[in-house]
Amino acid sequence: MAEADLCTVWGDPIPGREKQAFNVYNEAMQYWAGLQQEGKIERFDVTVLAFSGGDMAGLLVVRGTAKQIDSVRRSKEFQQYIAHGQLVASHLSVARAYVDEGLAKFMGWYQKVIEQAI
C-alpha cells in the first residue's frame, strides 16, 4: 500500500523548446510506465492543466512505499529525468508527499511538534 508520493510540478515550456518539451514528456511517460511494470512504484497519475495564465501547467504524482519512492528519487535515471525537464520546462519542482499510512504518521508527528511549540 502506498505511503509516500513523489510530486513533480512543471510550468509552460521554455520558449523555443516546445518540441523538446513534448519529447521529454513522452519519454517521462515511458519511464514511469516502465517503473510501474517492474514493480518499482505502485502507480503514477498525470494531470495537464488547461491554459490558465498561471505558473503551473501540469503535475505528475507517483505513489509507492517510502522505500520505493526513496530508491527512485536517488536513482541516476531520475536525476537525469529531472535535469532534462529543467532544460525544457519552467517552474519545475519535485517534492515528497505523504499519503495513506504515511500521512497518518506525519500528522501525528506534526501534532506533537505543534503542542510542544505552544
Language-model-derived ranges and their functions:
Residues 1-56, 64-74, 94-118:
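Short S/T/G/P-rich N-terminal loop/turn motif that feeds into the first structured element of a domain
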Residues 56-58, 88:
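Residues that flank catalytic or metal-binding motifs in active/ligand-binding sites
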Residues 61:
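Active-site scaffold segments
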Residues 75-79:
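A short linear boundary/processing microfeature
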Residues 80-98:
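Conserved short beta-strand edge segments in small beta-sheet-based binding/regulatory domains
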